[in-house]
Structure formats: C-alpha cells, structure tokens
Amino acid sequence: GRTVAEMVTAEGWESFRRQEQTALRTVSAPRTVVATGGGMVLSAANRIFMREHGLVCYLYAPAFVLSERLARAPEATQRPSLTGEAIADEVATVLAFRDPLYRTTAHCILNASAPLQDVIEQAVAAKKPPAAD
C-alpha cells in the first residue's frame, strides 16, 4: 500500500480520484460502514452513489477543530497539501468549498466535536428507522 501523497505524486489527483471512486463501489455492501476521504464528495457520481446505496453521515466539526486534529496526527505528513497554505488556512478554505457538498450528500449530520461516545450514539440513532406513531 501507498500513502495518498505517494499516489498523488506518482499518478496525479485525477488518477487518485478515479481509484477512489472504484474503491467506493468495490467496498460498498449492505450493512457495511465505509469511511471515505474528504474529497469523495467532489464527484457528483460519488455523491449520488452514496446517497442511493447507504446512509450517509457527515461528521461535522469546525475548521479549527479539524486543523488541531491534523496538526496532532502523525499521518498528517502523508496528506498532500491541496492549496499550499498552512494547515489552518487550508482546512478553512477546503471546508468552505466542501461543506455544502457534504451537507447535500448527507442523510444526517453528526457533531464530530462531541466526545466519541456521543458521536457513536448520534450515529446509532441516525440509523434507526423512525418510531411508528
């Protein structure tokens, strides 16, 4: 396996996004959790596929929270820069563009700033069908 940075350096973003799309379709199956990368929603075909083939949950967190997480994460060096900006600026720029895509693709929006147990409870509640009246 290669990191995203290695794949992008060797083959470019377009090739990476094609492989990402193939992977989405390959791993999608009933009763399966698929955690995608943030760029998955850039393709309209991916957005449609995800909405039609599963329950899409957007794990929302403000840009400053995401920036802090990326700065602390050891795998941060494996992530190629999308804009060439500092992490905080890049996250704000990218999130501003992608947030509407995430929101229109998602069936539910979860507060990813909450403690992990709360996020899990939100996800479980989101998957349950509505109670009968």
Give the positions of each predicted feature.
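Short glycine-rich anion-binding loops that position phosphate/pyrophosphate groups of nucleotides
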Residues: 38-41, 62-64, 115
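Glycine-centered loop/turn positions within well-structured domains
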Residues: 2, 14, 57, 64, ...
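A glycine- and Lys/Arg-enriched "phosphate-lid" helix/loop adjacent to the NTP-binding pocket
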Residues: 52-99
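ATP-dependent small-molecule kinase phosphotransfer cores
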Residues: 1-40, 44-51, 72, 101
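Short beta->alpha linker loops
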Residues: 22, 61, 86, 114-118
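NTP-dependent small-molecule kinase module
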Residues: 55, 68, 96-133
